[in-house]
Amino acid sequence: MRNKILDFSSVKAFLRQISEWGQGGTTEYGKQIKKHLSFQREYSFLHNYEEVSIDAVAKQYFHNPFDYIFNMHLNVVFFHAFKSYSNGFHQQLELVKAFNSTVLQVIKNENWFMPFCCQFSKNLVVLAKLLARRASNDQVKIKAIFQEAADVILQCYKLCQADLQTHAMNSKEIGLLSLLNCLCELYFKLGQIDDCNECIEFIMKNNSLFDIADNADKVKYKCYCGQLSLLKWNFKEAEECFTFALKHVPEQYPRVRKIILKYLIPTGIFLGKVPSKKLLETYDLMFFHEFTVALKNGNICQLSNAIESNGITFARLGISFLLHAFPSLCYRRIVRIVARIVGSKIIPLRYLYCAFALSTEGVNVVSFPNFLMTNIVDNCDKWNEFHCILINLIAKKNINASISTADNTLVLNDSTSFPSLTEATYTNPLFLEELA
């Protein structure tokens, strides 16, 4: 069996080859078919096609229901090629429904068709996203599109889940991870994090499902696990997931590696790890350099500018909630700088107040040791805000310290004044309503 992608001169040649592979009746042949069902493949032979001829040719090479399924597939490809996304989306919905009812539910103890079942689901997600873009800012319509796609794929997922067996040789479970990735992509867009979490927990309890999956599906799955860990504020677990994904993406796919790095880099920053400038330059991610420089310098003003100018980028990644926690890292850094300059575990609050104030004005605290001699006029509101910041740093365990109101000092613990960031606790703004 050849693994390369073939070009076809006609509908007849395409369907004849798919039919020959299908007669092999193994998942390897199924995977070969899958490669030729993606929208990324060349379907130049469709430019002069007649709808009637596809139906007739499909009946020559396939028995029911596959004649109907591949006929629909080529119709969808045509709609996609000519940007008729609404027609394509609704036709693809019917295709996936038909595959579920006439193949998954009917053909028992076989799984050779699962690879292209998964590809049909991926195609549905692609069309859902394209159609959603056409909906502009109509959030009700966009949600309806994603929900409709998710509901159809979920039915396939549940049926395969019910086919879970001790030996996966003939089980439909081999498609679970790929179907889960489709669901997670839609659930994240819908904000249905609990549904996504439920699917991922099922895979975690059945590790063999991960082991038997293709590398590409493993990478996508780990990315979704990483995003879910970020929402739970578990940076260590998120780092492990994104690192796995990055290591398993070949270097010839720089675009995919760049997407993963957009998640891995901020995750690493919250663990106290600064990316090299070379890495940022290689993948055109220098906007992260603004954050790392500001944090290193203890410059709140510079950090605020970085947050403001890159808010949209973080929002597109679905991690804008991380922006709320960057100031805490910077204030922690300032406390550490001041403690080193003072050379004592007991720091007068006026020194910290002065450092915080200068930082908000754009001064690099790390390179301005003379702030101890700077006189700043006290402002009641700013002093109260300063106190709140310190209390939050202590409450979140960013620093192990206490405030002495008797002599207006911050008293750092003798043991670990600045705990590892992996041990620090944060409050995710997304879950405030649940905690209230």
Regions found by a protein language model. Give the residues of each.
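Charged, E/D/K/R/S-rich low-complexity terminal regions of large eukaryotic assembly subunits
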Residues: 1-115, 135-136, 150-158, 162-173, ...
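Internal alpha-helical scaffold/solenoid segments in large eukaryotic proteins
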Residues: 177-181, 205, 212-231, 235-247
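Interaction-prone helical segments in low-complexity regions
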Residues: 185-191
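Alpha-helical solenoid cores of large eukaryotic proteins
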Residues: 123-130, 156, 182-183
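"A position-specific structural signal for the A-helix of alpha-solenoid helical repeats
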Residues: 119, 123, 178-182, 217-224, ...
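Short sequence/structural elements of tandem HEAT/ARM alpha-solenoid repeats
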Residues: 194-201, 236-240
